[in-house]
Amino acid sequence: MIQLRPHQARIVDSMSTNPKGQVIVPTGGGKTLCMIKDAQRVFNSGNKWGFLLKEPDRKTIVVVSPRILLAQQHSDSFEEFLGLNPMLQRKVLHVHSGDTSHESTTNADAIKYWHDKNNKFNKLIFTTYHSLHRIKESGINVDTIYFDEAHNSVQRHFYPATEFYSGLDNVRCYFFTATPKYNKSVESPSMDDEEIYGKEIEKISASELIDSGYILPPKMLVKELEMTEVGRTPVWKESEHLLDTIDECGVDKVLICARRIAQIVNLVDDTTFCSKLSSRGYSWMYITSKTGGIINGQSVSRDEFFETLSAWGKEDSKRFVVLHHSILSEGINVPGLEAALFMRNMNHVAISQTIGRVIRTDNDNKQFGIVCVPVYDRVGISTVKKVSAVVETILS
């Protein structure tokens, strides 16, 4: 049985009485569980046999994610919590270009064929913003859509499908995000357009979740180092700066947000960074769209990378450093992380999402999530200003 926290119960109650709306909840607030609980109610509602109906009314639910990795993670979570309940019989389809153990396609005709042949079952479709238009093109009936990390939906290529489904009276649409995206230009999509996005049916503050013990407060740490001109810091010096900063943080599980993919590769290939990590008892790993997953110098599949990352995160005594550029910042659940090191500046959304990776309550010994910026050039100075502003917003 799914047990909801008080703020989650408020969200689910609001979803049951509003056919459209925005749910603003900080990272770590358990929004996926709210989707699952609502889906359970929707699927159960179709089991009520009408007087003249020979079959129950089956439902189709779509879950939209910004990345394939998050779509796969959502799929696993839904399957785990919905389980094998015979009253929740369902078929699962993935509509994206990634690998999955479930049926998968991005062909509109194939989507319609799958939908029609499974008319006796409830249906769950996991897709990305890149591929949502394929479901639209299929012409299938959709009952409910959960737009996760909904700030992505305002992007020019993603907005038409969002606008289409939001404009249908018989489709429930919910937009989940910690960081709603607003645009000042009337010509650009914006989440303050209530005709498309609805009202904010629930807005949960980070301070409420911190006070309730559901997430941890972030702790800002600025590591001041020898200053150099931007672009003039040799990679061996960046390696030393990073190692000094990791030592300063004094924790076991560290996420490094690199400036460029090339910076990660150069640190690994051209310096003693990894060997010095090993001498400190740290394993190391990184993943990029160009190199794939690397664990302690060995190439691994994406599945093995994330399985290892999850396992290490749950192992209290394990020490590791994971480097990335952007692939781990949004939505991806990485348990156990204790500190995030910002090597580069980001927008407000990306900073908030990254901080969200380290303020989850993963173990009893963790009292806060460390948010650290090593400062050795002008990039570091500007990064401190933006990251500090986000931390202050979370704590206010």
Regions found by a protein language model. Give the residues of each.
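Inter-Walker segment of RecA-like/P-loop motor cores
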Residues: 85-136
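Walker A/P-loop
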Residues: 18-42
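Conserved interdomain linker/interface between the two RecA-like ATPase lobes of SF2 helicase motors
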Residues: 198-265, 270-271
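Conserved helix-turn-beta segment of the N-terminal RecA-like "Helicase ATP-binding" lobe
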Residues: 53, 69-105, 275
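Conserved RecA-like P-loop NTPase helicase motor core
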Residues: 151-152, 289-396
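Conserved Walker A/P-loop ATP-binding site and its immediately adjacent core
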Residues: 32-37, 51-80, 259-265
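Post-DEXD/H (motif II) to motif III coupling segment of the RecA-like Helicase ATP-binding lobe
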Residues: 151-215
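Conserved pre-motif I regulatory segment
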Residues: 1-24
